[in-house]
């Protein structure tokens, strides 16, 4: 009722000034009949009215007012309506599957009304009466189109395979949709990854990020240059406005400051791309982890001998450097109750099972024992510098041996202390698990690691400070967590457990991280 009181105060104050009344389509009157506000009805979500009045946009609790006028909704037969726009990658299968599961969990029947492949509507109804409760419309194109639809007032949620751009965030602010860069404006529905793919009979098993960029810039034109046969390289890529292509340009080509070759063959869908690559032993394409078809993924190779394969675990932990979170963005306005319930459902275990079932990577938190991390420990010993003595490695193993690593990991944006998008989502994910008592009676250790640049002792201190900062970020979100319910400790091992070589920005970025261990 706070907004209602504010609205009534504004109305009372303005009426006292004798402001002229305008022709409006609804009038909302308090239950005692003492105060009325007229305006153009913007939305009604089944609970709250939002009107454009002479005092600006006001939101009023429907339980405290009566509505009169031609614009008043049917309160008894109200049907919540909202539209989801954006990436076909997410909208073709993933979101429909999630809506079907949501309807089942909510004991509602579901009907799909199709206009065409990109435009369709789901109608959720009560099973006993058949009365429609909600209509969820879809406008599928790509991430760019989804944000454009939201700016134009044609969408309430945006499906995005990349983060919002500065230009889009600025336009959203101008449109009074809120700050799209803030965590509250987006959530990660699931995970995917940018992967390079080749035909099954291509002998190349791994390629460095630098060579991958040079391949797609046309600087490497023969497979022989990267250990393959003496044959020309044929390049395949998705359409330039696809989220996948944009991610590749930012994370791979942008880091190398290279331009894409004009000889790249473009494809409208990932299925078409992997099919073309699988049939050509001399082709290489950029696809998604979730779209492999008959092609074979190529691992990323580090200069110091470490390879990074895209797996469900490495995408969850971001140990694979080209992880691709799947975002759902919402504006800073109140959505219908059914929409809010659907958003809450997306964080449930049931939703994450759906994400995995349809081929994407879920965010269910797993535990990895140290016995399954032999390669990491071997790398730590092999790459340990002079400033990482044996006793420090022994201390690390002693601390971590009785614990298990969670697949929740925290990494930072390039050249910044700000957590990257997936890690910001992990803050909320871990906080919700803590509040739910998921780790009750156990100890969580936030363990910081660094790259190998600079003094080792200083790096250990920096790593420990990062671990403390991440712990604070998580506990600030987990507002219902009582300190007595769980032990949350911090530790810093600096450069003692490298995940990648320090000879590149992306390698150093992988090494600068905070892991979470539980025992």
Please provide the spans of the model-predicted regions:
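N-terminal hydrophobic targeting signals that begin at the initiator methionine
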Residues: 1-2
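Periplasmic OmpA-like peptidoglycan-binding domain that tethers envelope proteins to the cell wall
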Residues: 140, 145, 449-519
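Bacterial N-terminal signal peptides
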Residues: 5-18
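Short loop/turn segments at strand-loop or loop-helix junctions that form parts
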Residues: 412-413, 446-451
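Signal peptide processing junction and immediate N-terminal pro/mature segment
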Residues: 20-22
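Exported/periplasmic ABC-transporter solute-binding proteins
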Residues: 25-439, 464, 468, 472, ...
């Amino acid at each position: 009722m706070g907004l209602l009181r504010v609205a009534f105060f504004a109305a009372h104050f303005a009426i006292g000034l004798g402001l002229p009344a305008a022709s409006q389509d609804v009038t909302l009157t308090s239950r005692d009949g003492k105060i009325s506000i007229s305006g153009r009805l913007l939305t009604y979500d089944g609970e709250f009215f939002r009107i454009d009045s002479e005092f600006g946009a006001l939101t009023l609790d429907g339980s405290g007012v009566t509505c009169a006028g031609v614009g008043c909704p049917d309160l008894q037969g109200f049907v919540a309506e909202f539209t989801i726009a954006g990436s076909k990658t997410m909208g073709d299968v993933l979101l429909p599957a999630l809506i079907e599961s949501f309807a089942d969990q909510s004991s509602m029947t579901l009907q799909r009304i199709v206009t065409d492949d990109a435009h369709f509507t789901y109608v959720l109804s009560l099973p006993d009466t058949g009365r429609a409760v909600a209509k969820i419309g879809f406008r599928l194109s790509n991430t760019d189109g989804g944000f454009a639809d939201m700016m134009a007032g044609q969408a309430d949620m945006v499906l995005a395979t990349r983060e919002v751009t500065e230009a889009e965030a600025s336009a959203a602010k101008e449109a009074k949709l809120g700050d799209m860069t803030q965590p509250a404006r987006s959530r990660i529905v699931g995970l995917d990854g940018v992967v390079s793919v080749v035909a099954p009979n291509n002998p190349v098993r791994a390629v460095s990020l630098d060579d991958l960029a040079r391949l797609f810039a046309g600087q490497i034109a023969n497979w022989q240059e990267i250990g393959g046969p003496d044959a020309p390289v044929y390049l395949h890529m998705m359409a330039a406005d696809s989220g996948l292509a944009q991610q590749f340009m930012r994370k791979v080509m942008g880091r190398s400051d290279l331009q894409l070759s004009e000889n790249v063959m473009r494809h409208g869908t990932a299925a078409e791309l992997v099919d073309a690559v699988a049939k050509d032993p001399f082709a290489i394409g950029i696809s998604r982890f979730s779209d492999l078809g008959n092609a074979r993924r190529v691992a990323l190779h580090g200069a110091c001998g470490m390879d990074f394969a895209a797996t469900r675990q490495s995408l969850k932990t971001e140990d694979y450097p080209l992880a691709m979170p799947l975002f759902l963005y919402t504006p800073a306005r109140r959505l219908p109750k059914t929409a809010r319930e659907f958003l809450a459902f997306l964080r449930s275990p049931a939703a994450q099972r759906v994400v995995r079932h349809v081929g994407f990577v879920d965010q269910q938190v797993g535990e990895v024992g140290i016995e399954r991390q032999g390669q990491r420990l071997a790398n730590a010993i092999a790459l340990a510098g002079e400033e990482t003595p044996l006793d420090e490695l022994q201390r690390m193993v002693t601390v971590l041996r009785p614990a298990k690593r969670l697949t929740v990991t925290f990494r930072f944006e390039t050249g910044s202390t700000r957590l990257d998008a997936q890690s910001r989502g992990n803050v909320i994910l871990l906080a919700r698990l803590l509040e739910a008592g998921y780790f009750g009676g156990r100890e969580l250790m936030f363990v910081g690691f660094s790259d190998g640049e600079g003094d080792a002792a200083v790096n250990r201190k920096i790593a420990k400070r990062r671990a403390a900062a991440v712990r604070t970020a998580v506990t600030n979100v987990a507002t219902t967590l009582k300190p007595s319910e769980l032990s949350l400790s911090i530790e810093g091992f600096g450069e003692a457990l490298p995940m990648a070589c320090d000879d590149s920005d992306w390698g150093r970025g992988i090494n600068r991280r905070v892991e979470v261990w539980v025992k």
